[in-house]
C-alpha cells in the first residue's frame, strides 16, 4: 500500500481517479483541491456569465470535491495558488495576445501550477509515495506516453513537464475511456457522475473571449487589408481577437468569404485573403523555442507532430536542436501553423517533447505576417 495524493478538482475524472486508488488498489489516499482563479480579484468581469451567480464555478467545484471526499471517506485539503497562477500563467497569456500571438495557457498551467507549485506543496506537506491526477496520459520510467483513449489523450498539454516532475506522477485513467469512467462513477453513485466536463481556459473556464480580453488589453483598432491587392476592406478593434485561418471576420459587402492571412502588429494591420485566392496559410518548416526534450532516445525516422490539440499527426523531420530551440520540417505541408501555439513531437506512443512555435516558413521563405 502506498500513500498517494490526488489532485481532486471536483470533476468526474479526478473523482474516479481517487475511487480507483482507494477501493480498487487499496492505497492510502489524500485529496487536495487547488483554487487558482478569483474572478473579482482578477477583474474577470466582461465576458463572464457567472459573475452574478450565487456561487462561482470555482467554489461549486470545491463543494463537489468535498462531497466526493466524504463519499470516499478520504481527507481533503484546499490550497490557494491564485497569485501564482496570475503571475506565472495568466500574465504570459495576456502578453502573448498583446503581441498578436495565440498562446496555449493549459500547457503552462500544467508546467508551473498543476505539476509545479502543486507538487512542491504536496511534497512539503504530505511527503507521498506518488501524486495522481485525472489526466489521460501514461508515465513509465519518468517518460510520457499517450493514453489508450486517443480522443481524450492529454499528452499534448503535458509536453512541457520535465522528467523530474514526472518521476512521482501516476495517471490511473491511462487505460480507460471516458465512457468507462462515467460508468464507474455512476455504478458507485459518485455525485460527479453526470457532471459536465470543464472547458475553456485552464482554471478560468468558458468566456466570451473578445469581451474577456477587454478586461486586460485595450482595443487597438486598425485596418483590415486584402493581402493580395493591399486594399483596405474594413476595420478591426485589435489583431489579438483574430487567429490565423479564422473565417469569421465580419466583413460586409464582399463577393467571396475571406480568412485571416496574417497581421502586422506594428502598423495594426490585419491581413485577409479571399478563399479563391492563393493559399497564404501554408508552411513546411518551423522554429520552436523553449523546447522541452522529455525522451532523448527517440527514433529519428519515426517522428510525427501535432501543431494543435486533436490534430491528426503529421510526419516531420528534426533539422536541428540547439539547447531549447528546435527546427523541424514537414514536407506534406500544413495550414495555419500558428506562432504562440505548441508543437508536440511523438515517436509512436512516446511524447518526445514540445515547444512554442516561434516562426514558420514556406518553400524557404519566412512567413513574415504569421
Curated annotation (Swiss-Prot):
Cysteine-cysteine disulfides: 109-202
GO biological process: tRNA wobble position uridine thiolation
GO molecular function, one term: ATP binding
Keywords linked to the UniProt accession: ATP-binding, Cytoplasm, Disulfide bond, Nucleotide-binding, RNA-binding, Transferase, tRNA processing, tRNA-binding
Positions of region (Interaction with target base in tRNA): 104-106
Subcellular location: Cytoplasm
EC id: 2.8.1.13
Homology family: Belongs to the MnmA/TRMU family.
PANTHER family: MITOCHONDRIAL TRNA-SPECIFIC 2-THIOURIDYLASE 1, TRNA 5-METHYLAMINOMETHYL-2-THIOURIDYLATE -METHYLTRANSFERASE
Record-annotated active site: 109 (nucleophile), 202 (cysteine persulfide intermediate)
HAMAP family per record: tRNA_thiouridyl_MnmA
Binding site for ATP: 7-14, 34, 134
Main location: cytoplasm
Protein function: Catalyzes the 2-thiolation of uridine at the wobble position (U34) of tRNA, leading to the formation of s(2)U34.
NCBIfam families: PRK00143.1, trmU
Residues the record marks as site: Interaction with tRNA: 135, 341
Organism: Mycoplasma mobile (strain ATCC 43663 / 163K / NCTC 11711)
Segments forming a coiled coil: none
Pfam family, one: tRNA_Me_trans_C
Name of protein: tRNA-specific 2-thiouridylase MnmA
Cellular component annotations (GO), alphabetically ordered: cytoplasm
